Amino acid sequence: LRGNTGGLLTNAVFVANLFIEKGRLVSIVGRNGYRYDVMARDTDLEIKKPVIVLVNGASASASEILSGALKDYHKAKIIGTKTYGKGMVQKIIPLPNETGLNLTIAKYLTPKGKDINKKGISPDIEVEFTPKDISERKDVQLETAKYILEKMIAKK
């Protein structure tokens, strides 16, 4: 999910449901306090293998919903840097002359009730790129993910 700026809520929920078979996947809370919980659907597809998810400051919106759900349920280790923090639902209200007003109408919460908006998802293991890493084209986040994944597999 590193560099993934978002997408559709339905896709994030579909992927989360591959790892989480029961419980809340995300909550949508409106300005009036109305809360809608998107629940996992019971499937026989639950993935139980070790999983690492890479995130960074460009991971936003639907990718934060997915990484937040996986983190809250301990279904994946999240590695990288804090995500962007775009956890809001917006609606475009059409205006004259083919213009529109983008109005925020609700916010997303992780399964444990953490507000994503302006806060982002903090990784389980923070790994930042240094200028040297960048100049040497060294992907320290991916290297860390491989190392952690090998340790996770060895424990099983």
What name fits each language-model region?
Residues N17-R24, S59-A60, K71-K75, Y147-A154:
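Sec-exported extracytoplasmic/periplasmic mature domains
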Residues Y73-K86:
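Short, well-structured beta-strand/strand-turn elements
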Residues F19, V51, L70, G113, ...:
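Terminal peptide-recognition signature
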Residues L1-R2, I28, L54-N56, I79-T81, ...:
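Generic beta-strand/beta-sheet core signal
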Residues Q90-I93, L101-F129:
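Conserved P-loop NTPase
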Residues L1-A12, I28, Y36-V38, V127-K156:
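C-terminal recognition in membrane/secretory proteostasis and scaffolding
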Residues T5-S61, M88-P94, L109:
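Gly/Ser/Thr-rich loop/hinge elements
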